[in-house]
Amino acid sequence: MTRDQTATFGRHALRVAGSGLLVAGVVALGLLGWQWRANVTVDRVAVTGAQHAPPDTLRRLARVGRGTAMRAVAPMLVADRVARHPWVKEATAETQWMQGALTISVTERTPAALAVDAQGRPAYYLDRSGHAMPLPDSAGYDVPLVRGLEAEAPWTQPDTAQTPSSLRRVLRALPEAGVADLVAEIEMQPDDAIQLTTTPIGPHDALPVHLGSGNVSRKLRTLRAFARQVLASSPDEPIERIDLRFDGQVVTRTRPLDG
């Protein structure tokens, strides 16, 4: 073997040896990384975004305690468990391996109405979609009252206690029609029809409003326009009832002025 062949062979051998060492190093690091991941456990469960849902309650729903193997945590399953709390609208979960933490982020429902029982006592809140939330320990919300619903919390019997669709339509339409501050009460009738009670407007006290069925958003916009154009003024005869059951029409009942 010539001197050049010997040098070439030596360089080739060095490259092979170097490649082998590199592969061995990568494999060793991989094994160390796998071993590290296998030993990482959850040190803390952090909850963010919760205002009314107690964080400890959400942690119990998550069913991931300190010492749980991080590789055994399924974030989507954890989020699904947490989202079962009545106040939680959306939930996400994220594992943070380096910190040994599980972070749960929640978005809570926004109250749109307050259901009261037959004695007028607060029972539970409702959001715009008709989901019920238990009364929080913190301060209440300035939202319309809902009468005529079951006083028992719907989340205790989800298969039998459901918010009527007519009420859900009204709750969704109130802010869209710009009348959320105009409606003081929503009363469910036996046939699931809706009667509203306004806040005092101009010289008028609170007025009952028969809403009827049909296009709820359009009816509420009609009520808003009527309140601005008529109720805010002083009519010849005070209005004591408003009927919106007929599309495109506002029917009122008046009472004669005394004297």
Curated annotation (Swiss-Prot):
GO terms for biological process: cell septum assembly; FtsZ-dependent cytokinesis. It comes from the Bacteria. Residues 40-109 form the POTRA domain. Residues 1-15 are cytoplasmic. The keyword Transmembrane helix applies. The chain crosses the membrane at residues 16-36. It is found in: Cell inner membrane. GO terms for cellular component: cell division site; plasma membrane. Its main location: membrane. InterPro entries: Cell_div_FtsQ/DivIB_C, FtsQ, FtsQ_C_sf, POTRA, POTRA_FtsQ_type. Keywords: Cell cycle, Cell division, Cell inner membrane, Cell membrane, Membrane, Transmembrane, Transmembrane helix. It is a single-pass type II membrane protein. The keyword Methyltransferase does not apply. Residues 37-259 are periplasmic. Belongs to the FtsQ/DivIB family. FtsQ subfamily. Essential cell division protein. This is Cell division protein FtsQ.
